[in-house]
Design a protein with these regions (language model features):
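Electrostatic cytochrome c docking/interface patches
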Residues: 63-88, 164
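Sequence/structural segment immediately N-terminal to covalent heme-attachment motifs in c-type
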Residues: 1-5, 76-103, 121, 127-132, ...
């Protein structure tokens, strides 16, 4: 209990809500889930596996991973070429994550400019994400819980501190 999350599972106590932290947005996520196979209204987002799919070469993945760390105020590898990383980011990432990396709740694209990292902020963590993508899941609870229980759960999750 408490919603603190762990690597790969979101912290419900912070302000980093992939799909929005209002009561209505939380309720929609609880009702329909994320990539739930049994709900046509489930929330879906898909980041390409840029490395695995051959969109980016290994050195380009590393450049963009360093650039992402730099916009989040984190250290980068020695010799990192920020201009090259920025160009790769602009061409491949900005459409979803925004020019400044602030994310897009409508798409479920996380904020890359804050200190909150669902899968880790290390260079190898980011390289892994850019190379192979990530696809978190959450079941749709509308078929398992009655509407009153979902509303109660919505209010509880919102009260943990991260809701807006």
């Amino acid at each position: 209990l408490g919603g603190a999350g762990s690597k790969g599972y979101p912290n419900l106590n912070d302000d980093d809500w992939l799909w929005g932290g209002t009561l209505a947005e939380i309720q929609t996520t609880l009702e329909h889930g994320i990539r739930s196979t049994n709900d046509d209204k489930t929330r879906v987002s898909a980041m390409p596996a840029f490395g695995k799919d051959g969109v980016l070469k290994k050195e380009e993945v590393r450049l963009v991973a360093n650039f992402v760390r730099s916009i989040g105020g984190l250290s980068t590898e020695a010799g990192f070429d920020k201009a090259k990383g920025a160009k790769i980011y602009e061409e491949n990432c900005a459409a979803c994550h925004g020019d400044k990396g602030a994310g897009n709740k409508e798409l479920g694209a996380p904020n890359l400019a804050d200190a909150i990292w669902l899968y880790g902020s290390g260079i190898e963590d980011i390289v892994e994400t850019v190379t192979n993508s990530r696809a978190g899941l959450m079941p749709a609870w509308s078929g398992r819980l009655d509407p009153i229980t979902i509303k109660s759960l919505t209010v509880y999750v919102h009260s943990l501190g991260g809701g807006k």
